[in-house]
């Protein structure tokens, strides 16, 4: 009887344990969760996922929030706000964000058009 009960508990416990470890990295990475949300056009979910990381100063999260504002994905399009987020990411050395700041200066979106500033970034 004890052996049968132990076997039954093991049959339930082991698959559950394996499932936990398979799904843990997915749930544990808010950055990736934000990317998946973007792919599904769930922009508010992406914003929530990246906001927490942005508070921690994660450059790519700061940049991605800037992208949401630049494109108007899930928020009102706001180039000034996008510039703010891009500059925060750029200040942490993220080349992609530096490029984005330069592009906004080049196009005059959210700031006065300034070719010298565009080249600087």
Residue ranges and their predicted role:
Residues 1-8:
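N-terminal secretory signal peptides that target proteins for export/translocation
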